[in-house]
């Protein structure tokens, strides 16, 4: 059986980490999307919102832009959140 969602129904496992790191940098979703666009990734505020909420899949190519934009590594994006 092929499973493409997390146990809580999310379409990605790093959206919550992306949101936390973005907030720690005091970036709005719009400002983060703008930063990614300047780096060459075609995303908008709505795409960021859907990634962070788990409604959207995130490709490895997108992660290769997102990680440096958040001053982190792709590996760190997959680390569990400390609650």
Predicted regions and their residues:
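Residue-level detection of the helix-turn-helix DNA-binding "recognition helix"
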Residues: 23, 37-38, 53, 82
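A short, Lys/Arg-rich alpha-helix, primarily the initiator
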Residues: 1-25
């Amino acid at each position: 059986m092929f499973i493409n969602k997390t146990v809580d129904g999310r379409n990605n496992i790093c959206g919550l980490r992306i949101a936390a790191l973005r907030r720690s940098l005091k970036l709005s979703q719009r400002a983060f999307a703008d930063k990614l666009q300047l780096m060459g990734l075609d995303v908008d505020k709505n795409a960021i919102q859907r990634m962070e909420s788990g409604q959207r899949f995130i490709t490895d190519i997108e992660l290769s832009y997102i990680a440096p934009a958040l001053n982190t590594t792709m590996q760190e994006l997959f680390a569990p959140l400390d609650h």
